[in-house]
């Protein structure tokens, strides 16, 4: 399935139905009074969060959604039927903004949470509404009001508690696959992962914790280079970041600094998030070299640095222990 995490759409609520002009025409009521009914309300457009969805793909080619109009009034003071509301399902974690102003209209983070965006127009009045002592046979009516029109931007931000970040080929997909039941595409070349992979990792008490493997970031990501902003936004909601570094990279220290710099440049509090620094592929380097890299990283980050082997499943208990301590 294609991963779409942004969509711009136009929402048009339904127009209210018109009121009508009508008079009672019954056999024994030769001079019947006004009986024109009111129009029905136009349908509104409501966004509803659905935890079964993981992408905004439904809106890729559906850029304009129009709700149903209300029906006109009827004789004998019958009101027209209201237009049916249009329900749009979106993934949990969808933020809704006014496209023109950028103002946040809502943020749907819980399953079945809803937000009415475009409200349907009110129905018009039929001539029965205008009956008075001064006017016993009104011929006035009003048309239904137009429904609201909104142009909005939908932006999906994943609700994972733990985000796994690092340069391409650091081993993020392998790590999430051994920690959870997720089965991401894995290969020995950069940018294998082009969408965030989600996996539930079980705690000792049986409760699940959602991990997200964020696609490989590169230098300049905060400025939109590579996958850039497309995926940096997904770590905004995480509680913890696991910064994975490839031990066999040409310069692991430089790799660490690249990601730290991108977090700092992107802003929005990313650099202040709790981070666990992890050296991966420890089985492929000798112990002396591993100790040297670990010491340098600890001096730079002012944090404890863990060493693991995702493929051999070494050091994972220590990593999870550090994660659970921070959640």
Curated annotation (Swiss-Prot):
Domain OBG-type G positions: 160-327
Role: An essential GTPase which binds GTP, GDP and possibly (p)ppGpp with moderate affinity, with high nucleotide exchange rates and a fairly low GTP hydrolysis rate. Plays a role in control of the cell cycle, stress response, ribosome biogenesis and in those bacteria that undergo differentiation, in morphogenesis control.
Listed GO MF terms: ATP binding; GTP binding; GTPase activity; magnesium ion binding
Record-linked PANTHER family: DEVELOPMENTALLY REGULATED GTP-BINDING PROTEIN-RELATED, MITOCHONDRIAL RIBOSOME-ASSOCIATED GTPASE 2
NCBIfam families to which the protein is assigned, alphabetical: Obg_CgtA, PRK12297.1, PRK12299.1, small_GTP
Entry-linked InterPro entries: G_OBG (IPR031167), GTP-bd (IPR006073), GTP-bd_Obg/CgtA (IPR014100), GTP1_OBG_dom (IPR006169), GTP1_OBG_dom_sf (IPR036726), OBG_GTPase (IPR045086), P-loop_NTPase (IPR027417), Small_GTP-bd (IPR005225)
One Pfam family per UniProt: MMR_HSR1
Chain residues that bind ATP: 166-173, 191-195, 213-216, 280-283, 309-311
GO CC annotations, alphabetized: cytoplasm
Name of the top EC class for this enzyme: hydrolase
Subunit structure: Monomer.
Compartments in which it is found: Cytoplasm
Binding site for Mg(2+): 173, 193
Protein name: GTPase Obg
Secretion signal, residue range per the UniProt entry: none
EC numbers, comma separated: 3.6.5.-
Record domain Obg: where: 1-159
HAMAP family: GTPase_Obg (MF_01454)
Record's keyword terms, sorted: ATP-binding, Cytoplasm, GTP-binding, Hydrolase, Magnesium, Metal-binding, Nucleotide-binding
Cofactors named for this entry: Mg(2+)
CDD domains (alphabetical): Obg
GO biological processes: ribosome biogenesis
Keyword Magnesium: yes
């Amino acid at each position: 399935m294609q991963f779409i995490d942004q969509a711009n759409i136009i929402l048009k609520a339904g127009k209210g139905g018109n009121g009508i002009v009508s008079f009672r025409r019954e056999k024994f009521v030769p001079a019947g009074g006004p009986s024109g009914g009111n129009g029905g309300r136009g349908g509104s457009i409501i966004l509803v969060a659905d935890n079964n969805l993981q992408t905004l793909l439904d809106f890729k080619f559906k850029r304009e959604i129009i709700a149903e109009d209300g029906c006109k009034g009827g004789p004998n003071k019958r009101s027209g039927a209201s237009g049916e509301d249009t329900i749009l399902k979106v993934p949990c974690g969808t933020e809704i903004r006014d496209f023109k102003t950028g103002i946040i209209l809502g943020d749907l983070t819980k399953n079945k949470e809803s937000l009415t965006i475009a409200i349907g127009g009110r129905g018009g009045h039929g001539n029965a509404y205008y009956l008075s002592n001064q006017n016993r046979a009104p011929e006035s009516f009003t048309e239904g009001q137009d429904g609201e029109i909104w142009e909005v931007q939908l932006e999906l931000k994943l609700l994972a508690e733990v985000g796994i970040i690092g340069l391409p080929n650091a081993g993020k997909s392998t790590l999430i696959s051994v920690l959870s039941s997720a089965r991401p595409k894995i290969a020995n070349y950069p940018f294998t992962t082009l969408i965030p992979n989600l996996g539930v990792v079980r705690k000792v008490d049986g409760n699940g914790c959602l991990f997200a493997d964020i696609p490989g970031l590169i230098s300049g990501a905060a400025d939109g280079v590579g996958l850039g902003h497309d995926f940096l936004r997904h770590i905004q909601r995480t509680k913890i970041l696991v910064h994975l570094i490839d031990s066999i990279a040409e310069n692991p220290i430089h790799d660490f600094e690249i990601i730290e710099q991108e977090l700092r440049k992107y802003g929005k509090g990313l650099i202040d998030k709790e981070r666990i620094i992890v050296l991966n592929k420890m089985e492929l380097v000798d112990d002396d070299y591993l100790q040297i890299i670990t010491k340098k990283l600890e001096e730079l980050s002012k944090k404890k640095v863990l060493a693991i082997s995702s493929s051999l499943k070494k050091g994972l208990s220590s990593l999870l222990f550090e994660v659970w301590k921070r959640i």
